[in-house]
């Protein structure tokens, strides 16, 4: 009797869906099922017709969009040419992760579940809809659903009786074995870095470009609550090209102080070199990690010790702990009944992995190095809208960065890893300051026809991609650029004020501003749109304008859509149903595009 084979495929934007997928993989191995865990876009989707048992774990991003690492799969699975019997041999389940404060809550999971049924798949259970807004987080829905799922799988796909389960509390074998080198290898610092300063091909996540920082300038006033930076990189000889609307991905590093503290708490020699040996055949090396590598480089450039740990972190840490009191507490925090306490201890105050390890020093000091890559996730790249055009700034790339800093009940303020790291970089210091980065196409696409007007609505740092678009269109001689820009105060966070005003004086730009804190009643961009309803309607309906929106995903898309609906009804004399259909047509024809973030 063969061991049943399970495939777990995930689409993850922030790491939560990947974490849940890895957790399912560990539970499968405990039950002695054969199991593979892969990102959807790294899996050869043509093989799906031969898979008997698949669990899909997928997040919903933005306004109902699939994560970046499942977009190719998403396009393929919705091909109209796929036969309705394509997946008739597959049993499947879909676990979704979303946020019920957004209109399209778990849209990706729901739509994928329906599509798999259309293609002949058999659903083991209704889809699980994890909700970030629940007081206990997604686990409130996931835990009971996963329990039912394993019951069903083990009945339908029984394991041979002579193969016992691995009990909880016993750690599974690590994915890799750390082989520490006795002699220091003769390699340079460049080879130890995850990125290159002289790429042969366009840079990518696996081979970023080390871009020198040219300028790092604060662009908010001294009294403004937030530090916002305009940062410029030199991309000479990088093979990087980009257009307005594209996105740059940046791979941050942990601070020297945190890296040193981590090595001390775990009793690691930061200067020790190592290579990795997979424990099982066919396991690929960790992506983007050079070998041989030093412990210092692993911790500073790869392990996300500044992230807030998930429940699975506590589960594995409890298995590894040899200290009775600490182990008992870790077991409690990782149990189903301990989720409220875990929320209060970790999620609510945004306590980091490093801080948790400091709270459990006996356990941390005895963690076998082999488990570091199982225990701690990889640092994830952060995406930024490119805020400049190569036509205006050749061989340069600019971004606008809001530095994340906030206070919780913990004594130390919370800092965003990437934004704080970028803000700390000083291009004036001795030697070049370099940042690993690469570029990908963004979600915004601008019209090439010279006489097509564009309406851009940008709130705060959401204006960044529109600066790139305006620079590009001006270089091509395209007029008809209408920018609705919203910020708090004219003298504190009016980004590129002088630049916009010069373009307006020359006839290249029509600028409409909304300063929300300069009067008693707050004024936002949606109010300015309503005030200029006749102009907006004439541009959209009379001149075929494209409409763009960028900013925070929580309220802005809904507020702006409601303003547009009002304009369509008042200026276009459309009924509510016709106005809704008009807005839908704009979206379908890419004449209404959004780039939003949570």
UniProtKB/Swiss-Prot annotation:
Per UniProt, NADP(+) binds at 461, 516-517, 522-526, 559
Q: Name one Pfam family in it.
A: Flavodoxin_1
List the Gene Ontology MF annotations in alphabetical order. Answer: electron transfer activity; FAD binding; FMN binding; NADPH binding; NADPH-hemoprotein reductase activity; NADPH-iron-sulfur [2Fe-2S] protein oxidoreductase activity; oxidoreductase activity, acting on NAD(P)H, heme protein as acceptor
Q: What does this protein do?
A: NADPH-dependent reductase which is a central component of the cytosolic iron-sulfur (Fe-S) protein assembly (CIA) machinery. Transfers electrons from NADPH via its FAD and FMN prosthetic groups to the [2Fe-2S] cluster of CIAPIN1, another key component of the CIA machinery. In turn, this reduced cluster provides electrons for assembly of cytosolic iron-sulfur cluster proteins. It can also reduce the [2Fe-2S] cluster of CISD1 and activate this protein implicated in Fe/S cluster repair. In vitro can fully activate methionine synthase/MTR in the presence of soluble cytochrome b5/CYB5A.
Amino acids binding FAD: 350, 382-385, 416-419, 597
Occurrences of domain Flavodoxin-like (ranges): 6-150
What reaction gets catalysed by this protein?
2 oxidized [2Fe-2S]-[protein] + NADPH = 2 reduced [2Fe-2S]-[protein] + NADP(+) + H(+)
Q: Which residues form a coiled coil?
A: none
User: What HAMAP family does UniProt report for this protein, alphabetically?
Assistant: NDOR1
The Enzyme Commission number assigned here is 1.18.1.-
Quote the subunit structure annotation.
Interacts with CIAPIN1; as part of the cytosolic iron-sulfur (Fe-S) protein assembly (CIA) machinery. Interacts with DCPS.
Positions of the FAD-binding FR-type domain = 206-448
Protein family per UniProt? Belongs to the NADPH-dependent diflavin oxidoreductase NDOR1 family. In the N-terminal section; belongs to the flavodoxin family.
Q: Which cofactor does it need?
A: FAD; FMN
Q: Where in the cell is it found?
A: Cytoplasm, Perinuclear region
Q: SUPFAM superfamilies from the xrefs?
A: Ferredoxin reductase-like, C-terminal NADP-linked domain (SSF52343), Flavoproteins (SSF52218), Riboflavin synthase domain-like (SSF63380)
Q: What is this protein called?
A: NADPH-dependent diflavin oxidoreductase 1
Task: Cite the entry's keywords alphabetically.
Answer: Cytoplasm, FAD, Flavoprotein, FMN, NADP, Oxidoreductase
Q: What's any one GO cellular component for it?
A: perinuclear region of cytoplasm
Q: What's the superkingdom here?
A: Eukaryota
Q: Which InterPro entries match?
A: CysJ-like_FAD-binding, FAD-bd_FR_type, Flavdoxin-like, Flavodoxin/NO_synth, Flavoprot_Pyr_Nucl_cyt_Rdtase, Flavoprotein-like_sf, FNR_nucleotide-bd, NADPH_Cyt_P450_Rdtase_alpha
Q: Which GO terms describe its biological process?
A: electron transport chain; iron-sulfur cluster assembly
Q: Where does this protein hold FMN?
A: 12-17, 59-62, 97-106, 132
Q: Quote the Gene3D superfamilies the UniProt record gives.
A: 3.40.50.360, NADPH-cytochrome p450 Reductase, Chain A, domain 3 (1.20.990.10), Nucleotide-binding domain of ferredoxin-NADP reductase (FNR) module (3.40.50.80), Translation factors (2.40.30.10)
